């Protein structure tokens, strides 16, 4: 069977706990399906600043480039909030995206039937929600130049630049159409074309790409309307594609449809090298080390790795089935407590999912689907 080398970057806060859980589940996949996963660890974010003096050490970058895929935990925390801009933990995340050419961020948003009551929205709004946000990662206002703060004539000013090249827009929109073709065949392109020149270019390019996918429907939606529609009628969406900052904001909003940020995985795909997988949630320093963190987003990110980087579809389905089974049995970490069920620790949730992976059979999955 397969041999796969995975770079693990725990990062800060609960990143260490949730990546540890995902690694344990991947080890169970290896045992169940006969694969060998090799895990090698690197520093990123605040942990890297403390130990190496930089948010992304060269050793970490080298490790990632030599690996088949990257599993990331989370970066950041109040400890580093007063650092100068180049020594902020988030700079490590932005840098690794740029260095590995991680141009497409995929964030599935699914509301599990057993977690409908965990969402702050009415059950009839969220039950059956299943869409993907495709966020452009390497362009836009987070990377545009000039960027910074200056003092001119005694007045302090700050500037950021929202810049997109046509080819950057084209490749992310194309990715969205390819995804939609295998789903419900609808792409919603989100922009601010009534105000921003970059969004007008975005809309024009989306129209050009759409001509190559006549079987897929394209609609345009202004970002402010999209933010409202995600709450008003989330089931209308299939694939949402948008620029970097809009995607950053909308995906956090969409997380509440599933009940918790702790449920949302993500994949950041590279055009030429290893892709990176990480939970959408942050480092949550307030609960770090307390065995309270929800590991499911990290575990589902590992499932995305199995499917997208390694082509191991059955193995990914085994992990997803194990997560669904744990939730159906009423297990809940503290972030999901309002939905009822038995509150368990991080380690207990991981152990339950591991056991389900080891016991997994395709027949068991079929029986669950048709039960």
Swiss-Prot record:
Q: Which reaction does it catalyse?
A: (2R,3S)-3-isopropylmalate + NAD(+) = 4-methyl-2-oxopentanoate + CO2 + NADH
The record's comment on protein family reads: Belongs to the isocitrate and isopropylmalate dehydrogenases family. LeuB type 1 subfamily.
Q: Where in the cell is it found?
A: Cytoplasm
Pathway as given in its UniProt record = Amino-acid biosynthesis; L-leucine biosynthesis; L-leucine from 3-methyl-2-oxobutanoate: step 3/4
Arranged from A to Z, the UniProt key words for this protein are: Amino-acid biosynthesis, Branched-chain amino acid biosynthesis, Cytoplasm, Leucine biosynthesis, Magnesium, Manganese, Metal-binding, NAD, Oxidoreductase
Checking InterPro entries in the record gives: IsoCit/isopropylmalate_DH_CS, IsoPropMal-DH-like_dom, Isopropylmalate_DH
Its source organism is Geobacillus kaustophilus (strain HTA426)
Annotated substrate binding sites: 97, 107, 135, 224
Important for catalysis, annotated site positions:
142, 192
Q: Per its record, how is this protein called by name? A: 3-isopropylmalate dehydrogenase
Name the Enzyme Commission number(s) assigned to this protein: 1.1.1.85
Q: Which GO terms describe its molecular function?
A: 3-isopropylmalate dehydrogenase activity; magnesium ion binding; NAD binding
- Co-factor binding details: Binds 1 Mg(2+) or Mn(2+) ion per subunit.
Q: Where does NAD(+) bind?
A: 77-90, 282-294
What is a biological process (GO) this protein takes part in? L-leucine biosynthetic process
What Gene3D superfamilies does the record tag this protein with? Answer: Isopropylmalate Dehydrogenase
Its GO CC terms are: cytosol
Q: How does it assemble?
A: Homodimer.
């Amino acid at each position: 069977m397969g041999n796969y080398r995975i770079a693990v970057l725990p990062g800060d806060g609960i990143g260490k706990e949730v990546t540890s859980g995902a690694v344990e589940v991947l080890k169970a996949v290896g045992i169940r399906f006969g694969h060998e996963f090799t895990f090698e660890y690197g520093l990123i974010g605040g942990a890297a600043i403390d130990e190496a003096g930089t948010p992304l050490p060269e050793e970490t970058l080298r490790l990632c480039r030599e690996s088949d895929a990257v599993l990331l935990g989370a970066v950041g925390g109040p400890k580093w909030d007063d650092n100068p801009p180049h020594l902020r933990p988030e700079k490590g995340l932005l840098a690794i995206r740029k260095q590995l050419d991680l141009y497409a961020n995929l964030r599935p948003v699914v509301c599990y039937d057993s977690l409908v009551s965990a969402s702050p929205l009415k059950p009839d709004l969220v039950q059956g929600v299943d869409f993907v946000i495709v966020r452009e990662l390497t362009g836009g206002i987070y990377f545009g130049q000039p960027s910074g703060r200056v003092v001119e004539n005694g007045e302090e000013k700050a500037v950021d630049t929202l810049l997109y090249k046509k080819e950057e827009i084209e490749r992310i929109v194309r990715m969205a159409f390819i995804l939609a073709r295998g789903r419900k065949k609808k792409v919603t392109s989100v922009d601010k074309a009534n105000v921003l020149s970059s969004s007008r270019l975005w809309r024009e390019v989306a129209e050009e790409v759409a001509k190559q996918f006549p079987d897929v429907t394209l609609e345009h939606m202004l970002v402010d309307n999209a933010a409202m529609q995600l709450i008003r009628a989330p089931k209308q969406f299939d694939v949402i594609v948008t620029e970097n900052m809009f995607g950053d904001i909308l995906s956090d909003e969409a997380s509440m449809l599933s009940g918790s940020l702790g449920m949302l995985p993500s994949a950041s795909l590279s055009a030429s090298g290893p892709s990176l997988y990480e939970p959408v949630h942050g480092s949550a320093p307030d609960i770090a080390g307390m065995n309270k963190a929800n590991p499911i987003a990290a575990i589902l990110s590992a499932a995305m790795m199995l499917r997208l980087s390694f082509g191991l579809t059955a193995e990914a389905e085994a992990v997803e089935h194990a997560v669904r089974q744990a939730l159906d049995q009423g297990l809940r970490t503290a972030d999901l407590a309002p939905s009822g069920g038995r509150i368990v620790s991080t380690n207990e949730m991981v152990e339950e999912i591991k056991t389900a992976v080891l016991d997994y059979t395709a027949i068991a999955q079929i029986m669950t689907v048709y039960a």
